A protein has these predicted regions:
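Conserved thiamine diphosphate
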Residues: 38-90, 267-283
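Short acidic, glycine/serine/threonine-rich loops at helix termini
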Residues: 12-14, 35-41, 68-71, 95-102, ...
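Conformationally flexible catalytic loops at phosphate/diphosphate-handling active centers
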Residues: 84-179
């Protein structure tokens, strides 16, 4: 497991791990990288910095998804011979106390490809069956050898999909490389990954009741990015796409996920659909349903931000009043702490006691 410091410091090692086809999995709680100021809270700055290392990247949106999809990363790494960076939002997901359905090791036993494990063991450095590894190569052969990894990455989306289907069969879920949620005839679609997808889901439920034609595509397998699987879930009726990135790459014409989506849509039936790009949630800035509604309503700003009032470059979208999107019967509480005053600990203990009381079983 790793967070910001560990994730950033081992980038150079990841090139070697991926290059030597070592099937490791690093679980990362995605956090902000310090720039003009230190911020230890959640965004995707650190994981995006690793996107060209050769690690596959799998993203979860909730605590339950972390439980369900982490085995997919491990099994796919073994069979696909590609290491995985398995990430979820720092603090918002990593520190959330939530009821989940737990897996047992026995549940996972029949999912593991023992033939792939044995093949990996046979590739261990051993004088009985020597092999060459980690050599220094000159310009005459390095390029060719580097390209030889292509078949593994081309095959990996199907490997991940195979294990997602095994999880689905076991627990009745519907995990895919890209999951769509919303109206079947949606005209406005957001593409995002991470915990913001839960906020978007809740907002969509609210908007569907009002007759809006909206939806969201949740990215689960970010690397390798499978254009085929993205296009398979894109509504044929879409007229506008907004891509939300939880990072800022100064000087770029767009953030990483946006650039991937634009490239995936090129030369397809969706090539003429306008694609907007927006930033949100840097340093754990809250993202609310009102801001998601502003994204759906935006038709003018091709590049935008939400959650702040940008009075310098005027990229922020105007936000309307906050709607009540929570289901009826839900009571929400927010507790403010001053830092090291025991607020977090007290709430954790209180929650544990309430959950143990039979009249509070639905917490």
């Amino acid at each position: 497991c790793a967070c910001l410091v560990g994730s950033e410091m081992c980038i150079r090692d990841r090139y070697k791990i991926a290059g030597e086809q070592l099937p490791c999995v690093i679980d990362v709680s995605a956090r902000c990288v310090a720039t003009h100021a230190l911020n230890i809270f959640g965004d995707h700055s650190d994981v995006y910095a690793c996107r060209q290392t050769g690690f596959a990247m799998l993203c979860e949106s909730s605590v339950q998804e972390v439980m369900d999809l982490t085995p997919v990363a491990h099994c796919a790494a073994i069979k696909g011979k590609v290491p995985f960076l398995n990430f979820f939002d720092g603090f918002r997901t990593s520190h959330e106390i939530q009821k989940i359905e737990m897996w047992d090791y026995e549940d996972l036993k029949d999912m593991v490809d023992m033939d792939a494990i044995n093949a990996f063991r046979r590739h261990a450095l051993n004088p009985e069956h020597p092999c060459q590894r980690g050599s220094a190569q000159n310009p005459d052969i390095f390029f060719q050898a580097r390209e030889s990894c292509n078949p593994y990455y081309d095959a990996l989306p199907e490997v991940v999909e195979e294990y997602m289907n095994k999880v689905n069969a076991k627990i009745g879920t519907d995990y895919k490389l890209f999951n769509y949620y919303g109206a079947e005839d949606a005209e406005k679609v957001i593409i995002a990954m991470g915990s913001v997808c839960e906020t978007i889901d809740e907002t969509i439920d609210y908007l569907l009741k009002a007759g809006e034609k909206v939806g969201v595509i949740k990215v689960r397998l970010y690397r390798p990015f499978s254009a085929k699987h993205l296009l398979a879930v894109m509504p044929k009726t879409v007229k506008q796409i907004s891509v939300l990135d939880r990072t800022k790459e100064p000087g770029s014409i767009g953030e990483p996920l946006y650039l991937d989506v634009v490239a995936a849509l090129k030369d397809t039936e969706f090539a003429d659909v306008p694609v907007f790009t927006g930033r949100y949630g840097l340093g754990s800035k809250d993202t609310t349903p009102a801001q998601i509604i502003a994204v759906y309503n935006n038709t003018e700003k091709k590049r935008f931000t939400i959650g702040i009032n940008d009075d310098v470059t005027n990229l922020s979208l105007p936000t309307g009043p906050s709607p009540v999107t929570a289901p009826e019967g839900i009571t929400s509480c927010k507790f403010w702490g001053l830092g090291a005053d025991g607020t977090v600990g007290a709430n954790t203990v209180s929650y544990t006691h309430l959950r143990a009381h039979e009249t509070c079983a639905d917490l």
